[in-house]
Amino acid sequence: MNLLIMGLPGAGKGTQAAKIVEQFHVAHISTGDMFRAAMVNQTEMGVLAKSYIDKGELVPDEVTNGIVKERLSQDDIKETGFLLDGYPRTIEQAHALDKTLAELGIELEGVINIEVNPDSLLERLSGRIIHRVTGETFHKVFNPPVDYKEEDYYQREDDKPETVKRRLDVNIAQGEPIIAHYRAKGLVHDIEGNQDINDVFSDIEKVLTNLK
C-alpha cells in the first residue's frame, strides 16, 4: 500500500502516521528522517543537501525531490509499500512526485487528509505557556496550571497566536492546491480530525482496509 498523509500543523498527523505504520506495516517515510539518513549514508543527494544546510541555506526542491527518489528506490519499499509524511509540501513537489513514481513504476493508492478547523488548531497550538522559574510546560485551555498568574508564565515566540496563525495560513495556501491535485485523481480520503485520537484512527483504518 502506497500512501500520503496530509494535515495542518497540530492536526495529529504524526500520531496517526505512527498508528498506520504499526497496523499496516508500511515504511514510514518522513522528510526529516529521509534527510538525516541520506546525509549519514552520504548518498549523492545527501552530500548535496548537507552542503546547503551547512551554509544555512534552504535545500532546493530538486535536491529534496532527489532524496525522495533515492528513498523510494530502495528495496524495502517494493515489499512493504510506504506512508509519505511531510512531502510534498508544494504543488511543484507534488508534480515532481508524480514523475518519480511513474519512473519507478509505483502507483500511489491513497491520500489521507486529516481535516481540523484552523480556529481549533490556533487554540490548540497557541495555548502553550512555560513557567518562568520551573520551566514546566502547561496549556491555557487543555492543561492549565492550578494557580495561574500571567506574570509567572511566558510564551515562546513560535507559540504566540500571531506566529501560529501565519504558519497555518502558509500551510493552508501551500496545501490546498496539493489536495485539489490529488482529489482530481480520486485519491483523497478526508478524515475528521476533530475527534478522539482512536476515533480518528478508526476512520482511517476503515479507509485503508477497503484499499487493501
Swiss-Prot record:
Compartmental location: Cytoplasm
InterPro entries in alphabetical order: Adenyl_kin_sub (IPR006259), Adenylat/UMP-CMP_kin (IPR000850), Adenylat_kinase_CS (IPR033690), P-loop_NTPase (IPR027417)
LID: region residues: 127-159
CDD domains: ADK
One Gene Ontology cellular component annotation held by this UniProt entry: cytoplasm
Cited SUPFAM superfamilies: P-loop containing nucleoside triphosphate hydrolases
UniProt entry keywords in alphabetical sequence: ATP-binding, Cytoplasm, Kinase, Nucleotide biosynthesis, Nucleotide-binding, Transferase
Annotated residues for binding of AMP: 31, 36, 57-59, 86-89, 93, 156, 167
Uppermost EC category: transferase
Domain of life from the UniProt record: Bacteria
Pathway: Purine metabolism; AMP biosynthesis via salvage pathway; AMP from ADP: step 1/1
GO molecular-function terms, A-Z: adenylate kinase activity; ATP binding
UniProt cross-references to Pfam families, sorted A to Z: ADK
Enzyme Commission code: 2.7.4.3
Catalytic activity: AMP + ATP = 2 ADP
Residue ranges, annotated region (NMP): 30-59
Domain note: Consists of three domains, a large central CORE domain and two small peripheral domains, NMPbind and LID, which undergo movements during catalysis. The LID domain closes over the site of phosphoryl transfer upon ATP binding. Assembling and dissambling the active center during each catalytic cycle provides an effective means to prevent ATP hydrolysis.
NCBIfam families registered for this protein in UniProt: adk, PRK00279.1-2, PRK00279.1-3, PRK00279.1-4
Described purpose of this protein according to its UniProt entry: Catalyzes the reversible transfer of the terminal phosphate group between ATP and AMP. Plays an important role in cellular energy homeostasis and in adenine nucleotide metabolism.
Subunit structure: Monomer.
Family: Belongs to the adenylate kinase family.
HAMAP family: Adenylate_kinase_Adk
Name under which the protein is recorded: Adenylate kinase
UniProt lineage: Bacteria, Bacillati, Bacillota, Bacilli, Lactobacillales
